[in-house]
């Protein structure tokens, strides 16, 4: 959330505090080395950087509407989201699967692998275009966000392809680089 990020920076300046924000992989020296080697051209021109988030996610089912638990200010929880009835799937951990609060595994776990894949692309700023297709497949529940999704980011000479698969026999969270 860009607005919340700006508020965080303003608060840090006002209170003279140090704030660190980012994806966890940026603090891991092994990924920094991988990105550096990929960008160096040692293996040739990078054509495709792929990020994979194959992480089994079961159905969240259906939770009945009711009163929020004591201690939860549900109005504050909603923030700028539309007013709606409380049910237990809207809060931890399942909030990721509702468009008003999250964007599925793309922004939950996937953002970490997407960041690494993008890190390997020299001079990547904003993509020229993005195409994405997916859906919530395999079960009926209250969730809204895609559990299966493919995104293609066009950075010109290099494409970033990112996949989310929530219906897999085993977890696989990784990145792949394809060279000319």
What are these regions (language model features)?
Residues 33, 45, 50-103, 108-180:
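Contiguous beta-strand/loop segments that form the cofactor/metal-binding neighborhood of enzyme cores
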Residues 1-27, 41:
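Beta-strand-loop-alpha-helix segment that lines the small-molecule cofactor/substrate pocket
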Residues 19-22, 38, 49-51, 61:
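Alpha/beta-hydrolase
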Residues 13, 37-40, 65-68:
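Short, hinge-like loop/turn segments at secondary-structure boundaries
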Residues 27-28, 138:
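Acidic-and-aromatic substrate-binding clefts and catalytic sites of carbohydrate-active enzymes
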């Amino acid at each position: 959330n860009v607005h919340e990020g700006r508020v965080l920076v303003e608060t840090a300046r006002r209170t003279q505090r140090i704030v660190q924000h980012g994806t966890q992989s940026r603090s891991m020296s092994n990924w920094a080395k991988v990105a550096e080697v990929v960008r160096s051209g040692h293996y040739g021109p990078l054509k495709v950087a792929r990020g994979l988030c194959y992480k089994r996610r079961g159905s969240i089912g259906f939770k009945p509407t009711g009163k929020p638990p004591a201690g939860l200010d549900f109005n504050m929880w909603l923030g700028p989201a539309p007013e709606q009835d409380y049910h237990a799937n809207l809060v931890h951990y399942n909030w990721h699967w509702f468009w008003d609060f999250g964007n599925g595994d793309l922004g939950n776990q996937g953002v970490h692998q997407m960041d690494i894949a993008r890190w390997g692309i020299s001079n990547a700023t904003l993509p020229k275009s993005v195409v994405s297709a997916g859906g919530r497949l395999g079960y009926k529940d209250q969730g809204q966000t895609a559990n299966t999704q493919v995104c293609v980011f066009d950075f010109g000479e290099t494409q970033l392809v990112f996949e989310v698969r929530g219906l897999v026999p085993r977890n696989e969270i990784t990145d792949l680089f394809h060279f000319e």
